[in-house]
């Protein structure tokens, strides 16, 4: 059955090869002949635990990929982060060619699965599905990128291409401050013309031209305190917990229907005495049912598609916070996380080019996917500087949880898509 499915995958591209250039056909033929080697590279990387905080594991995956890229003529560097960030660093592979646009290819070495978390080795579940830690997010995508580059080398095209392949070591849990963790990443991206990221694909027919940004907010409420028998009176007021509840519910009423905007209070503490450990996201509260609460503390996130949407939402939230209940006072402060990857004209033009590519390959149309289906990613840090696309990696289900899977039927086609697309962009 597996052989039959691979044959069908070959036919999907073979039937329209007349519309492809000779180097594109050579790259596709290489992938058909070497899909087993690509799968073995995937298995080897999945079977190395590389949770973000497992520094040795992240570096081991980096060494595995570096060996493959070095064979292709890439210059290999390891970019160390400051010791204070407690992260492994990043793998950077550079190939200098003679012509064409300079491509910035993005992967990441780490996964969410730390050594003490439930996750498993690469395991084939059936003829179309395999599972394993990070198998699609994003070791599957890393191998898509590397195998596509191998195919272009075999087709005699890589020698002319200008490529930086950048694999971050802390995408899932960036070192802090984030500006330090991504300084080198941003600087190198700004020397390039186009960025392509190999995060999980959502099937064969969509790609990410936009990703929502992420930011945080902190709400602090203080209030008069006293015996609960006097709550709601002019002298005592409503208390901090009621004020926090009013604010959160008004956020929900006024902002929850706006497309691509989400906000989530993930942590709340209130009572007579409140202690917060922001570093470990923990809190303690003490209170009694007959005491009006004088303090409440809430933290949450805010996700948005554009900077304008973010700022408009923040202004509404400030206005809501300012309308305090009697006897209370509230303040809200905001923190920036990852910016949005906005659906710019340059990104949409890349979608059109990819759509032409997949049509020529016989895969069918490719459209821009729903930005609301994705959170922020490494590409968000550089999206303001150059045209970019994401979601060019492996497809599957269940990312970030035990049982994460990869779709083995779509995998060869996604590698071919990447190879032909990179070839066309580099012309």
In which residue ranges do the predicted regions lie?
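Bacterial Sec-dependent N-terminal signal peptides
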Residues: 1-23
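Metal-dependent amide/peptide-bond hydrolase catalytic core
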Residues: 19-26, 51, 68, 84, ...
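Acidic/His- and Gly-rich active-site-bordering loop/insert found
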Residues: 19-133, 153-158
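Short glycine/proline-enriched loop/turn "hinge" motifs that connect secondary-structure elements
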Residues: 34, 113-115, 157, 209-213, ...
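Extracytoplasmic/secreted envelope proteins and their assembly/folding machinery
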Residues: 39-43, 62, 66, 142, ...
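Alpha-helical metal-binding/catalytic segments enriched in His/Glu/Asp
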Residues: 105, 126-176, 217-221, 232-254, ...
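Short, flexible, mixed-charge acidic loops at enzyme active sites
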Residues: 114-124, 210-215, 278-283
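Acidic/histidine-rich catalytic neighborhood of metal-dependent amide-processing enzymes
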Residues: 138-214, 270-280, 426-427
């Amino acid at each position: 059955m597996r052989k039959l499915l691979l044959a069908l995958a070959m036919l999907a591209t073979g039937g329209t090869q007349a519309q492809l250039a000779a180097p594109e056909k050579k790259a596709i033929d290489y992938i058909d002949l070497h899909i087993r080697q690509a799968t073995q590279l995937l298995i080897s990387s999945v079977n190395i635990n590389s949770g973000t905080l497992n520094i040795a594991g992240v570096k081991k995956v980096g060494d595995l990929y570096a060996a493959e890229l070095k064979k292709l003529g890439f210059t290999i560097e390891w970019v160390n982060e400051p010791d204070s960030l407690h992260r492994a660093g990043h793998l950077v592979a550079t190939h200098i060619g003679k012509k064409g646009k300079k491509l910035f290819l993005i992967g990441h070495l780490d996964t969410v699965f730390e050594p003490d978390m439930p996750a498993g080795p690469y395991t084939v579940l059936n003829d179309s599905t395999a599972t394993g830690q990070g198998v699609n997010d994003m070791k599957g995508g890393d191998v898509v990128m590397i195998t596509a580059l191998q195919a272009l080398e075999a087709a005699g095209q890589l020698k002319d291409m200008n490529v930086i392949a950048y694999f971050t070591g802390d995408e899932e849990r960036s070192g802090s401050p984030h500006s330090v963790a991504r300084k080198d990443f941003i600087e190198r991206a700004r020397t390039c013309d186009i960025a392509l990221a190999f995060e999980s694909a959502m099937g064969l027919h969509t790609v990410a031209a936009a990703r929502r940004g992420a930011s945080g907010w902190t709400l602090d409420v203080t209030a008069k305190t006293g015996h609960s028998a006097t709550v709601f009176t002019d002298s005592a007021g409503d208390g901090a917990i009621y004020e926090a509840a009013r604010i959160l519910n008004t956020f929900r009423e006024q902002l929850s229907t706006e497309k691509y905007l989400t906000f989530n209070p993930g942590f709340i503490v209130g009572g007579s005495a409140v202690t917060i450990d922001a570093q470990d996201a923990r809190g303690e509260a003490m209170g009694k049912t007959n005491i009006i609460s004088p303090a409440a503390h809430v933290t949450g996130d805010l996700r948005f598609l554009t900077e304008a949407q973010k700022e408009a939402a923040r202004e509404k939230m400030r206005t809501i916070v300012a309308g305090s209940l009697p006897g209370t006072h509230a303040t809200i402060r905001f923190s920036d996380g990852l910016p949005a990857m906005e659906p710019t004209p340059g990104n949409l033009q890349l979608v059109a080019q990819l759509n032409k590519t997949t049509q020529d390959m016989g895969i069918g149309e490719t459209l821009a996917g729903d930005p609301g289906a994705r959170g922020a990613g490494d590409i968000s840090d550089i999206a303001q500087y150059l045209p970019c696309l994401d979601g060019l990696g492996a497809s599957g289900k269940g990312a970030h949880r035990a049982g994460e899977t990869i779709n083995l039927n779509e995998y060869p086609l996604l590698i071919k898509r990447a190879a032909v697309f990179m070839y066309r962009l580099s012309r």
